[in-house]
């Protein structure tokens, strides 16, 4: 399931993030890539110890916590600490690849399964040419280039790439989610059911039928969740 999270970051948060990035130091993105990804990856990233990166990551995590759409679509168990990357100049693209199934967390004592990938766009689309996030999965090929502050989530199993940036710079925040529900198909069913329940409540309130279906939703989640 591919889903757009419109205005995940507020205008004030976005302005703060862009101010933090004005004088940031960037590292070669290949330094954090695996064997396969190193062949395709040509971008830059903020260092792990970057103060700007830490502050932007904290803003993004806070925004995720208040996004009901993110919570119902991903059913998050854990979120990989967000990182910030940049495409432009000589470091302008990332070829076809699949994200690593498991990521080492910063403390090196734990790992996270990458069920869901997420990109939060930090640059307005009129500031750069190219740079589309191209995702190829069971829902068909998709080209994603969103307004600054918007985010996209999609299955971590997807083959995807970032097209070359031919003018300007494309900055974004990226991370992965380990879901309580491992199966993308089961997550989609739960999401569709939750959205239908929301509409039922709006139309009929807490009717006996709505209460019964809510119970079915939670029983399915109880059956499928890995806590």
Curated annotation (Swiss-Prot):
Q: Which domain of life is it from?
A: Bacteria
Name this polypeptide is given: PKHD-type hydroxylase Veis_3084
Fetch the HAMAP family from UniProt: Hydroxyl_YbiX (MF_00657)
What InterPro entries would the database entry show? Oxoglu/Fe-dep_dioxygenase_dom, PKHD_C, PKHD_hydroxylase, Pro_4_hyd_alph, Pro_4_hyd_alph_FE2OG_OXY
User: TM segments?
Assistant: none
Q: Which residues bind Fe cation?
A: 97, 99, 160
Stretches the record annotates as Disordered: 27-51
First-tier enzyme category under EC: oxidoreductase
Question: In its keyword annotation, does this UniProt entry include Iron?
Answer: yes
> How is the co-factor bound, per the entry?
Binds 1 Fe(2+) ion per subunit.
Q: Where is the composition biased (Polar residues)?
A: 33-47
What NCBIfam families does the database record attribute to this sequence? PRK05467.1-3 (NF003974), PRK05467.1-4 (NF003975)
Q: GO:BP terms for this protein?
A: DNA damage response; intracellular iron ion homeostasis
Which keywords does this Swiss-Prot/TrEMBL entry list? Dioxygenase, Iron, Metal-binding, Oxidoreductase, Vitamin C
């Amino acid at each position: 399931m591919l889903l757009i999270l419109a205005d995940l970051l507020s205008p004030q948060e976005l302005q703060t993030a862009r101010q933090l990035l004005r004088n940031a130091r960037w590292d070669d993105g290949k330094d954090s890539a695996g064997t396969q990804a190193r062949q395709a990856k040509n971008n830059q990233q903020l260092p792990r110890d970057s103060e700007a990166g830490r502050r932007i990551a904290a803003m993004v995590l806070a925004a995720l916590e208040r996004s009901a759409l993110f919570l119902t679509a991903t059913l998050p168990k854990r979120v990989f600490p967000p990182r910030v990357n940049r495409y432009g100049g000589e470091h302008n693209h990332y070829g076809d690849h699949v994200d690593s199934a498991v990521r080492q967390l910063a403390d090196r004592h734990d790992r996270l399964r990458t069920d869901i990938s997420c990109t939060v766009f930090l640059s307005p689309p009129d500031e750069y040419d190219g740079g589309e996030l191209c995702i190829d999965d069971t829902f068909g090929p998709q080209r994603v280039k969103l307004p600054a502050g918007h985010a996209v989530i999609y299955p971590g199993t997807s083959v995807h790439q970032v097209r070359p940036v031919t003018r300007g710079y494309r900055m974004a925040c990226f991370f992965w989610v380990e879901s309580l529900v491992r199966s993308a198909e089961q997550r989609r069913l739960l999401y569709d059911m939750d959205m239908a329940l929301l509409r039922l409540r709006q139309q009929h309130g807490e009717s006996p039928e709505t209460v019964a279906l809510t119970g079915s939703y939670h029983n399915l989640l109880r059956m499928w969740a890995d806590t």
